[in-house]
Amino acid sequence: MYPDKDVIHQFLSLLTEPWKECSPKGQLDLRFLANGKSASTAQFSDDQLMDATDHIVQLNINKLNAYVCINPVAEKPLKAGKGAKDEDILRAHFAFADCDEPGSAERLKSSALPHDFSVVTGTRPHLRCHYYWQFDQPLQNLAKWSVIQAGFAKAYGSDSCVK
């Protein structure tokens, strides 16, 4: 499987579009992982989406999986190899369900409220998707966001670590 640059850019654009209405806008926090390798991280502002896209593509080609923090993080230096922590998150613009377990993607798609967009993260050995719902207004109460995320995990069998 080869990374699709256009799809990656579209995904990053969808995530960061609502940030433009907020102050501070924040930045993207990216993490890259692979078995037997140290974690790698990178941060990009919303006006550096092509740079972020190119970075993701290059590291995917080098067999690292990319993980994007869907919420904007504070614009501050982070320790090398360390991604943003909960206290670095500025606010939430989306709820999402990480459906990587067998049957969870199909279960959510057939019974949840319509999602705003989704990303297929794999098809073998089974369908794996992430589903996204945009809030009408940014959610400042991140404890409430965690409750929403836990609700998705319980109802649909999505990843319970996403909170």
Question: What does each model-identified segment do?
Answer:
Residues 1-129, 133-147:
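Signature for HUH/AEP ssDNA processing cores
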Residues 150-163:
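Flexible helix-coil linker/hinge segments at domain or subdomain boundaries
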